[in-house]
């Protein structure tokens, strides 16, 4: 289940960035008294009573006007609101209710998202009675806090996490293989999605994603039940190019967290960018199955070494995830598109693979016989037994005499033996070394 997204919204200078920095545990947003200082949406991870979530700080929402920066901030806040699972609507208890607060409240009510109304700047110098006028917003019971002094934040977070969906609400989605097509704008995500949907012709339904604003396409295919998580709508004609990456970052992150198989789509005509590396790095860190698709292969002049050389370049760029397969396609012409779902299914099967304990220990025992662990600090690692404890990704616990005796090269050797024996192409694997207690 993906971490919920919580967005802090409100007009400028009510204290959103101060609260964001408290929740993020570090100073991420610039905090000044000048309206409009938080121009970009910024996000960070947070946790309360064991529940993890992503918190988003937005630029303040001003009434419509001709100021280009304020217009962009308002648009960005609207995108964040669309994506959110819960919205923290912050108002200023010292200044009181304003016309802009009422305008924001109207916009939030239209979103039909769970809202926690927070009255900030209620401290020793401001009476608690100041919160009552905010009932007029029609949002619900206000929660009073002082973000600068840290007062009332626990009560506010209790309200926030109580509005999260329970895990049971996502059970219907669990029977599907969740696939995210991610990548920079214009690499062909939309074309590939449309090509796959058009070829399969077995769409069950197009319904709003259960936890995000993207449209998820539910399919029943020869490869099982699939969900294509749509991140293709990141670019809209009304948005200038410079805004696209800012809008896409959180959506891409959310799609990766939801998916089982992260499919990075690259443009064969362009060099691999830092953005590509960040996207795939995030999928790797989140232990997702990964497939790399190189699109627009029809536009490349080729000889018998072109694909091999391209693969070598990719392997150097993505050396930290050598397990990921590559597929060269053209969404425009349909070249090799028929292989996309079968490759995704293979990655997923390996991602959710279980190995019998007996077979697993036979492989590791033989590996140790072929090559003993190196001596570290005059001692040698001894592996007593290994067991698989989880899937998605496959997770193995090795019970040993002393984990500190494990050399990184021997860890890599054991991983290679597991991969050679059980075919974990397309997925990372976790290897945990624990001391066996007598």
Swiss-Prot record:
Residues 353-437 form the KH-like domain. Coiled coil: none annotated. GTP 1 binds at residues 10-17, 57-61, 120-123. GO terms for molecular function: GTP binding; ribosome binding. GO terms for biological process: ribosome biogenesis. The keyword Nucleotide-binding applies. GTP 2 binds at residues 183-190, 230-234, 295-298. Keywords: GTP-binding, Nucleotide-binding, Repeat, Ribosome biogenesis. Associates with the 50S ribosomal subunit. GTPase that plays an essential role in the late steps of ribosome biogenesis. This is GTPase Der. It comes from Clostridium acetobutylicum (strain ATCC 824 / DSM 792 / JCM 1419 / IAM 19013 / LMG 5710 / NBRC 13948 / NRRL B-527 / VKM B-1787 / 2291 / W).
């Amino acid at each position: 289940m993906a971490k919920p997204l919580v967005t802090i919204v409100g007009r400028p200078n009510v204290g959103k960035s101060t609260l964001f920095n408290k929740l993020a545990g570090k100073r991420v947003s610039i905090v000044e008294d000048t309206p409009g200082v938080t121009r970009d949406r910024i996000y960070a991870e947070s946790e309360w009573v064991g529940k993890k979530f992503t918190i988003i700080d937005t630029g303040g929402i001003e009434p419509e006007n001709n100021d280009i920066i304020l217009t962009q901030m308002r648009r960005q806040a609207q995108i964040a609101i669309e994506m959110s699972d819960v919205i923290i609507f912050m108002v200023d208890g010292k200044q009181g209710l304003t016309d802009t607060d009422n305008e924001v409240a109207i916009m939030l009510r239209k979103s039909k998202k769970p809202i926690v109304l927070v009255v900030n700047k209620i401290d020793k110098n401001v009476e608690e009675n100041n919160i009552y006028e905010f009932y007029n917003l029609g949002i619900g019971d206000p929660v009073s806090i002082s973000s600068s002094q840290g007062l009332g934040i626990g009560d506010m977070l209790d309200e926030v996490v109580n509005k999260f969906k329970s895990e049971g609400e996502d059970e219907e989605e669990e029977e599907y293989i969740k696939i995210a097509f991610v990548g920079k704008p214009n690499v062909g995500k939309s074309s590939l999605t449309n090509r796959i949907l058009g070829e399969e012709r077995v769409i069950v339904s197009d319904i709003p994603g259960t936890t995000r604003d993207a449209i998820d396409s539910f399919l029943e295919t020869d490869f099982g039940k699939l969900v294509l998580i749509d991140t293709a709508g990141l670019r809209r004609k009304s948005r200038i190019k410079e805004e696209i990456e800012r809008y896409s970052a959180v959506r891409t992150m959310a799609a990766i967290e939801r998916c089982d198989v992260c499919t990075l789509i690259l443009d064969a005509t362009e060099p691999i960018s830092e953005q590509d590396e960040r996207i795939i790095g995030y999928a790797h860190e989140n232990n997702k199955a990964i497939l790399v698709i190189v699109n627009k292969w029809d536009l490349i002049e080729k000889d018998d070494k072109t694909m091999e050389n391209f693969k070598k370049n990719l392997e150097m760029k993505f050396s930290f995830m050598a397990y990921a397969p590559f597929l060269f396609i053209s969404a425009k012409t349909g070249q090799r598109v028929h292989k996309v779902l079968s490759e995704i299914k293979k990655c997923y099967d390996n991602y959710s693979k279980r190995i019998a304990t007996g077979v697993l220990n036979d492989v590791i025992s033989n590996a140790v016989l072929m090559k003993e662990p190196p001596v570290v600090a005059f001692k040698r690692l001894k592996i007593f037994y290994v067991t698989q404890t989880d899937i998605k990704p496959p997770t193995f616990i090795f019970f040993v005499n002393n984990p500190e005796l494990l050399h990184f090269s021997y860890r890599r050797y054991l991983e290679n033996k597991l991969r050679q024996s059980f075919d974990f192409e397309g997925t990372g694997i976790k290897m945990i070394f624990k001391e066996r207690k007598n």
